[in-house]
Amino acid sequence: VPGCNPLASPGTGLPGCVQQAITDAPLTSAKIDFVAPSFEWPESEVLNLTYTRDLSDTLQLEATYLWSKQEEALYKIVDGSPLVGDQPQVPTLTAPDGRPIYNQTGYRTYKAGLYNDCCGTREVFSLALSKSFNDGDGKFTVSYTNQNIDELSGMTSSTSNSNFGKTGAIDYNNRKAMRSIYETEHRLLAALSSTHYFLGEDSPTTFTLVFERKSGLPGYVTFDTFERTVGDYQSEAFGYDHNLNDDSSALLYIPTGVNDPIICWSRNCGDEGSPAAIARAEEVINLLHNVYGLSEYAGSIQPRGSFNYPWQSSLDFKITQVLPGFRADDEVIITLGIENLLNLID
């Protein structure tokens, strides 16, 4: 506001001109985060079962099963369309693949509310077998863990726009439970530790090796919806504001083949059937169907976790040396660790 000094009369609250400017500010040109009136603290149901048994004096078995169902807190955008209660509705305008197209018409002026939605589920099973030796100074453990986790959203950020759009979806406002981006379906672990007393009984030296072999994280393919021009939101970014479309995580429609009727292989469908368009189509179909293995989703929108990244292996080594301190009860602990010895071999 011209002539308004927000620092006038420090310690006495906001000057009147500042308060008036806030009152007069048009909400349509502001980014707004709010908590929906219907929001309640999310609830979870959890079942945890653990079984342990000593198979001998030196051999232990442990099995664990964890199941949970969790309501999630997630953001939904309000684009100016009528609400039912406090809930935004699904737009009637749809893309050729069936997903809704929203009608946001601002630039970095989205309105996002925090709502409840249900539900994600999680199943985790683990089995571990441990063998001690050398009078307890050595231990060998092998374990296997399996995860089956579905969630609505990964909630990957501290800001509403990133939480809204960073985790892949068909319709961000009406998410369906899909495979978690954090799921490790299979994990094998072997750990060997051995303690020795080269420097005396009060100065143990422990050597530890940990080998891990695990399946790759879930992956999925998305559209590039990065769009700054408001007039192109609906045609290029499913109607989302630039602050939301820049995450480009709209799950990709998988074409049936080079002749899929809802796909254009040239700009604005202006050069279909040309050698360049045909070559482009064949390259994309080969990538999606053969490289990523998504042919089973042809003619539909592939879900999150439609493929897995490669398995990973690691071998970590650590030496821990305990030394006496300056006082009777003091200890000095020195640790040397090498993360993934396999990198030194390969």
Stretches found by the model and what they are:
Residues Q20, T206-F326, I333:
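Extracytoplasmic gating/loop element in the C-terminal half of outer-membrane beta-barrel translocons
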Residues V35, E45-L49, E123-L127, H186-L192, ...:
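Hydrophobic, lipid-facing positions within transmembrane beta-strands of outer-membrane proteins
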Residues F34, R175-K176, I301-S306:
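Surface-exposed cleft-lining segments at the edges of enzyme active sites
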Residues F198-E201, L323-E331, L342-D346:
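Substrate-binding/catalytic groove segments of enzymes
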Residues I338-N340:
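Gly/Thr-rich phosphate-binding loop signature of adenosyl cofactor/nucleotide-binding cores
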Residues E62-V221, V291:
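Gram-negative outer-membrane beta-barrel transporters
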Residues V1-G113, C118, Q234-F238, H242-S249, ...:
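Solvent-exposed loop/turn elements at secondary-structure boundaries
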